[in-house]
Amino acid sequence: MTGNQMFCRENELDESFKQLASYINIPVGVLLPFKSQCFVRHYNKGQIVYYSSDETTHIYLLLKGNIMRENFNLNGDVYRYLNREKVLFPLNNLFQDKVPNEMCTALTDCEMIGIPRDLIEYLCKNHEEIFVKLFSLLSETQCQHIEYNMALTSKLAKERVTKILRYLCQTVGYDHDEFYEIKHFMTIQLLSDMAGISRETTSHIINELKEEKILFKNSKNWLVSKDL
C-alpha cells in the first residue's frame, strides 16, 4: 500500500469515527484510543456482510447504502428487516452469548465502520450516556420489528402490503413533505418476499396503488404518498 493510500484510509477512518461519535452522542476523543481496533469497509451490492450474527465479533454502523437483515427462527421462518444509512446493528448481540441467527446482505453498495462488540460493551459499562443511547436505539428497533410482524398478521393481501409499505417508509424511506421516497433497491419480488404473498398478487396490489395515486415510480425509485 502506498503512502497516499494509507493516508486516505486513515482519513476515512477518522471521518467515520466522527460520524460514530456523533451518532452515539459522545466526544470523539472518547473513541480515539480504540481506533486501531476498528475498520471501515466497502461492500458491493449483493455482497454478504455476515452469514450468521453469532459468528460476527463486531457491531456495525452503516454509513452509506442499504442492507437487508434476515432472521431465521427454529421453525424455518424468515423475517426480513431493511435498513438505510445511520443504523447500528446487530444490537441484539450485545451482553449475551446466545443470539438470534441473522444474515446480513448489502442491497446497494455500502460503507460501514466495524467496532468490536466487546469494545461497545466496555464503553456502555463506563459511559452512561452511551448505554442510554444504545438502549434507546434498541427499543426503537424492537418497535419497528413489532410493527413489521403485526403487518404480517393481516389476513387481506392488500392490507398486508399497505402496512409493510408504511413500515418501509419509516425504516428506509426519505421524507419529502407529502411523500416518502424508497430507493431503487426495492422491487416487487423483495416486497413479495417480505409480505409472504405471491409476486403476481403483490404486482396487482402495486398497480392498484398506482391507479389510486398512492404510489408512483420516479426513475427506479418508489414514491409513496403519506395518504397511504
Curated annotation (Swiss-Prot):
Q: Where are the transmembrane segments?
A: none
Provide the alphabetized UniProt keywords. Activator, cAMP, cAMP-binding, Cytoplasm, DNA-binding, Nucleotide-binding, Transcription, Transcription regulation
GO cellular component annotations of the record: cytoplasm
Q: Which InterPro entries does the entry mention?
A: cNMP-bd_dom, cNMP-bd_dom_sf, HTH_CRP, RmlC-like_jellyroll, WH-like_DNA-bd_sf, WH_DNA-bd_sf
> What GO molecular function annotations does the UniProt record carry, in alphabetical order?
cAMP binding; DNA binding
Residues holding a nucleoside 3',5'-cyclic phosphate:
22-141
A biological process (GO) of this protein is:
regulation of DNA-templated transcription
Q: Which residues form a coiled coil?
A: none
In this chain the HTH crp-type domain maps to 155-228
Please verify whether the record's keywords include Metal-binding. no
What SUPFAM superfamilies does the record point to?
Answer: cAMP-binding domain-like, Winged helix' DNA-binding domain
Q: Which residues bind DNA?
A: 188-207
What Pfam families does this protein map onto? cNMP_binding (PF00027), HTH_Crp_2 (PF13545)
- Localization annotation: Cytoplasm
Report the protein's function: Positively regulates the expression of the arcABDCR operon under anaerobic conditions, thus playing an essential role in arginine catabolism. May also control the expression of genes encoding proteins which are involved in anaerobic metabolism. Can bind cyclic AMP.
This protein's name: HTH-type transcriptional regulator ArcR
Origin species = Staphylococcus epidermidis (strain ATCC 35984 / DSM 28319 / BCRC 17069 / CCUG 31568 / BM 3577 / RP62A)
Q: What gene name is given for the protein in this entry?
A: arcR
